[in-house]
Amino acid sequence: MMQELIIEQTPKTPLIDLNQVTGDLLFSGRSIPENATKVYEPVLNWVTEYVLQANPTTNLRLDLEYFNTASSIYLAKMLKILTRIN
């Protein structure tokens, strides 16, 4: 079983709550980090592992009021990884 990944919200980064047990993947807030790699690399690593043992139902909630170009690149990478769920 995977550990839940929680990254607390800041004025420049969203709340990220990824839960393998429930299948809920939540992104909420603004995503304008100065270093998108620092924020999103752990997310990509978690999602890559998740698709190998995904919950039968996965609910992705992107409740982002704004995201910058760097964030959009990582979000697109994450979505591409999630398409591997069978």
Model-derived regions: residue spans:
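Amphipathic alpha-helical interaction surfaces in cytosolic regulatory modules
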Residues: K38, V43, N59-N86
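STAS-typified acidic loop motif
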Residues: Q3-L44
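A general structural motif
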Residues: T22, N55-N59
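Intrinsically disordered, low-complexity segments enriched in polar/charged residues with Gly/Pro
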Residues: M1-L5, Q53-A54
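Helix-loop module immediately N-terminal to the HCX5R catalytic loop
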Residues: V43-V51
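Residue-level signal for alpha-helix termini/capping positions
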Residues: V51-L52, T83
